[in-house]
């Protein structure tokens, strides 16, 4: 029997975490994090990782499973997430994937076969050398020239994914975005795909306010601890919220400039997330602009899920 799952996606600061917990309590669910950065230990504030006292008794999976410089890929996420879906379902619970890393979520729930992916190790080495000599931005410009769609959704600092996209283009002559669409065959599960959105001005205000809260909660100290451990050449510390403060610690920018850059990068990331989910997945969208209507929205989304998956509350 095909497992039933709920997937909640959307931009940063739209309210995915809070909604996921509310729905998990109503539906007897367990949450699988669909965030590529929340897997890392010691990166809590900058990734907006849910705190233990905020989980309200709902089990959460794929948090704090790797050290910051331990390698982790979409292939490993796919394997772990699918195993969790099987395990949670077998225990009579409902798997709920919550996150904003589109490729990871897509790889977990679709018939995505990475063994089919073309590769060229020598070309990868050459691109890594180029990034080391000319910087991540130069590599990203190359991707923009051949595959603007992928360039729009892959952050310039995510060198590993930029290289992967260029490698696929090099090997196939097709943009990575086009190759990915060919890989996305069908959903593996009976899925309710929920997308959360909000008015842009409201979302951007929330993002700016959240950055200020992160600073107050100790983000500078969190990033400083990674910096002082000498963690530099790994993907985790290139994440938004970490890279900007590394620039501050390196003396490249003032603290105020780093914080403003963090806000700007977060807003841009939210825009890219929305664009990606609208173009890549058949999502049912719900507007979360008004926080006063949260309880109403929970009921509305619950009814949609119950109808889509033929569920009852507290399964």
UniProtKB/Swiss-Prot annotation:
Record flagged with keyword Iron-sulfur: no
Cofactor: Mg(2+)
Chemical reaction(s) catalysed: adenosine(37) in tRNA + dimethylallyl diphosphate = N(6)-dimethylallyladenosine(37) in tRNA + diphosphate
Pfam families linked to this entry: IPPT (PF01715)
Gene3D superfamilies tied to this protein: 1.10.20.140, P-loop containing nucleotide triphosphate hydrolases
Site entry: Interaction with substrate tRNA: 101, 124
Binding site for substrate: 12-17
Record-level GO BP terms: tRNA modification
Binding, ATP: 10-17
Molecular function GO terms recorded: ATP binding; tRNA dimethylallyltransferase activity
EC number: 2.5.1.75
Catalytic EC class: transferase
Region (Interaction with substrate tRNA): 35-38
Keywords: ATP-binding, Magnesium, Nucleotide-binding, Transferase, tRNA processing
Assembly and oligomerization: Monomer.
Function summary: Catalyzes the transfer of a dimethylallyl group onto the adenine at position 37 in tRNAs that read codons beginning with uridine, leading to the formation of N6-(dimethylallyl)adenosine (i(6)A).
Family as reported in the entry's similarity comment: Belongs to the IPP transferase family.
HAMAP family: IPP_trans (MF_00185)
Protein name as it appears in the record: tRNA dimethylallyltransferase
Organism per entry: Geobacillus thermodenitrificans (strain NG80-2)
Originating gene: miaA
């Amino acid at each position: 029997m095909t497992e039933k799952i709920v997937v909640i996606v959307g931009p940063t600061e739209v309210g995915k975490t809070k909604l996921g917990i509310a729905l998990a309590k109503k539906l007897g669910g367990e949450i699988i994090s669909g965030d590529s950065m929340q897997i890392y230990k010691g990166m809590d504030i900058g990734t907006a990782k849910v705190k233990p006292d905020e989980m309200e008794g709902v089990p959460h999976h794929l948090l704090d499973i790797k050290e910051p410089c331990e390698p982790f890929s979409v292939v490993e996420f796919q394997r772990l997430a699918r195993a969790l879906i099987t395990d949670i379902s077998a225990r009579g619970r409902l798997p709920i994937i919550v996150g904003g890393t589109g490729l990871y979520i897509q790889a977990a729930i679709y018939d995505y076969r990475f063994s089919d992916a073309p590769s060229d190790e020598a070309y990868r080495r050459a691109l890594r050398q180029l990034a080391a000599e000319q910087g991540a931005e130069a590599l990203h410009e190359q991707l923009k020239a051949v595959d603007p769609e992928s360039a729009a959704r892959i952050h310039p600092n995510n060198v590993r994914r930029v290289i992967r996209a260029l490698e696929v283009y090099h090997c196939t002559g097709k943009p990575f975005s086009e190759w990915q669409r060919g890989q996305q065959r069908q959903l593996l599960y009976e899925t309710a795909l929920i997308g959360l959105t909000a008015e842009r001005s409201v979302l951007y205000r929330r993002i700016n306010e959240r950055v200020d809260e992160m600073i107050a909660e100790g983000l500078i100290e969190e990033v400083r601890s990674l910096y002082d451990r000498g963690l530099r050449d790994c993907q985790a510390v290139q994440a938004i919220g970490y890279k900007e403060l590394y620039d501050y610690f390196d003396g490249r920018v003032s603290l105020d400039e780093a914080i403003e850059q963090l806000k700007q990068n977060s807003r841009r990331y939210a825009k890219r997330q929305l664009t990606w989910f609208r173009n890549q997945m058949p999502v049912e969208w719900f507007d979360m602009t008004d926080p006063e209507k949260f309880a109403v929205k929970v009921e509305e989304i619950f009814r949609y899920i119950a109808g889509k998956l033929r569920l009852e509350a507290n399964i």
